[in-house]
Amino acid sequence: MTKPFKGVIKLDVRDSKPDWTPYELKKAPAGAPNVLIVLYDDTGLASWSPFGGRINMPTLQKLADSGLMYSQWHTTALCSPSRSTFLTGRNHNVNRCASIMEATDGFPGAAGRLPAECATIGQVLQDNGYSTFWLGKNHNVPTEDTASGASKSEWPLQKGFDRFYGFIGGETNNWYPTLVEDNRYVDQPSTPEQGYHLSKDLADQALRMLRDQQSANPSKPWFMWFCPGANHAPHHSPKAYADKYRGKFDDGYEAYREWVLPRMIEKGLFPSDTALTPINPMPKAVADTVPGDAVRPWNSLNDDEKKLFSRMAEVYAGFSEYTDAQVGRIIEYLEQTRQLENTLIFYCAD
């Protein structure tokens, strides 16, 4: 509702008094913190080193050592619903996001379009004096709206974000991604032969946005939603990072479970009497109805299969650590510009 005019209008401008207050944008409170959320994809609690896992995460470890590590964390185990709840603070069914965007069905809880009453954190903060940035994955646009000529009503700039750079959908090629900047598709800035990787590109763009913010309006707080392609398939890691894990997973996935559980108990993440679930928790009669829906015992694999699955784990781990290094560049910039102490950082996965 428009605020009433409180100025004075006389016959002569010299006797009149303007009133700009109805048009002033709301400012954030003095000292309001910046907020950075780093949201990985498809990553289990037992993967990362701060939680006892084998994947080295120096940036996350640094933040965990000086912060708080949560042991209670709920996701829907699907991209779109989890991200909708994070963006709005509301149940995913209330958000009409019961499943991924490719599975919307037109029913009230799964229509894929956010109700107007479900404001995003971007909209709330934007209306209260924040700059808002979204980088990386956006799996909250209905499939029929992903084309360049389709409706943009569910795209980030229409959901409270000043800037967006990333991709729309569940996954993309990290060497040759389908990129979107704001409301348009764009070409990637370089090739893999020139050193391109999506995780690095996202960090580059995040730093560019933050530098622009600092030069244009350094007193204005910002919110950044940083969602890399990691660790969702396709798993694309620079070879040097994948090779750091050569042989680290040769003992197999069953042995890894046995190895990591005591470490997680020691860190206080699980009660001391926690036992492993069966590697195939579903009854065999049920699992057999869905081809590939059961894990084969490691010792039943032949040598080529073991070699393949070990390498897949190495690439996954390298992908994760490489992306963590890119997040580290953002943290380093915040340290250099003395913003870190006034920045809330959440480092998590769906």
Model regions and ranges:
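Formylglycine-dependent sulfatase
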Residues: 1-350
